Amino acid sequence: MGPVMLDVVGHELDAEEREILDHPLVGGVILFSRNFDDPAQLRELVRQIRQAARHPLLVTVDQEGGRVQRFHQGFTRLPAAQSYAALNTPQEAQRLALEGGWLMACEMIAMDIDLSFAPVLDLGHGSAAIGERAFHREAESAIPLAQAFIDGMHQAGMKATGKHFPGHGKVSADSHKETPIDARPLVQIVEHDMVIFRTLNACGKLDAVMPAHVIYSQADSRPASGSPYWLQQVLRQTLGFEGVVFSDDLSMNGAAVMGSYAQRAQASLDAGCDMVLVCNNRQGAISVLDHLSAAGSPRIARLRHRGQVDREGLMGSARWKQAHQDLQRLHQRWEEAKQA
């Protein structure tokens, strides 16, 4: 599979998109809310994407739950990660997290979507970019919830992507708008933020990792997403991670310090990413395809979904009905708690 993941504009493909998707460097597509009208339309769009590519690619989405859920009508309203621990006993929180990962993955696989970029492994709720997307502020409480969520995804046949390595939760700035700088001592990041990544990787739960567009100034002057130190020395060598490394979206302002779109993509791949995301800027994506010097990684193909999910059969199953009811209720309780 090629090393570039990009987006499409609407509910169906246009002629230029069909041509772009057939480019040998394109290995994936990420979908957004603007691509969704209803489940039938979404399933047809995914079919068009796979047909246009004429080579294997990943179809992906951010369907985390809470404020980051791209598809709503016809899908379960998933609770925010923070709500699992905030409103339940530890045992019930883990049960619900497992069902949340399973149900989310099943609903996406029924659309022939390979991957939802989840779960968020950042610690703490103070970051503008993270907030309720994090399970907990402490690793010892977040780890069992993240592990349960991943176990649910794996039961459904979907691989898990931990984000945003080595941890985005302690910077208040939003990397969508600027490049955050985390000036904490390196030992603090290693012994706090990275614990969840290290633990989940050691027990074989992480299939992919997405680094942060954050500069950890005590370690490197480059964002982690373009840093050989973080991706090769720490992630690959020290942690022994063998899965796929995705860049976060290179159109985010947090990546702008790496140069033009083509320079950002090349820097990320040279640093150790297997695949780069270039979203919401057609000319930027074309520039990357025109100038990139890179081959696809064989690791990427491992992330294709392995599930066989019929949507009607899924929604008729006892497990889906119970999980749907429990998760919708948790979502509603969380929204009410935030208003209190």
Curated annotation (Swiss-Prot):
Major location category of this protein: cytoplasm
Top-level taxon of origin: Bacteria
Site (Important for catalytic activity): 174
Gene3D superfamilies assigned to the protein according to its UniProt record, in alphabetical order: Glycoside hydrolase, family 3, N-terminal domain (3.20.20.300)
Enzyme class: hydrolase
Similarity comment: family membership: Belongs to the glycosyl hydrolase 3 family. NagZ subfamily.
The protein's name in its UniProt record: Beta-hexosaminidase
Organism whose genome encodes this protein: Edwardsiella ictaluri (strain 93-146)
Gene coding for it: nagZ
